[in-house]
Amino acid sequence: MDRDPLTAGGPTIRTLRAADCARLVAMDHAISGRKRQAWYEGKLRRALSEADVKISLGAELDGMLVGALLGSVHYGEFGQPEPLAILDTVLVDREFARRGIARALLDQLLFNLAGLRIERLRTEVAWNEQELIGFFARSGFAPVPRLVLELAVSAAG
């Protein structure tokens, strides 16, 4: 799965490791302003230890983690009979943005999913995240005919 940056012309793409947590938290903090140590610890634990199929990837340049994709594979959720990969985190160090890191990660993920015979990859994006929406659109993602519903628990009653 690992790609050699000298032969592939880009970052080395590899599976994420538990030791990547601090770097993920630091990259996310620089972007979001939030420190989500517990969130990333849980996410990595589920991705690395609890998942039947491990699809989360990291991108390295010169031995430093500069980007990551976190996701999972679901079987039969929400009435879908076929397996579906879910991409829930795309993270690239700001200093390495717009250098093809996210694209390289996504290309490797798609290659891996095809090898697993998983035919669809889904993600959700906030409507105001225009840069991320643009990236996904350029990568071939399109809206699906599904309606996501939400209820504020405090308003229920």
Please place each PLM-identified region on the residue numbering.
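Terminal substrate-recognition subdomain of acyl/acetyltransferases
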Residues: 1-6, 124, 137-157
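Amphipathic alpha-helical recognition patches that constitute DNA-binding helices
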Residues: 23, 86, 131, 148
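Conserved GNAT acetyl-CoA-binding A-motif
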Residues: 113-125
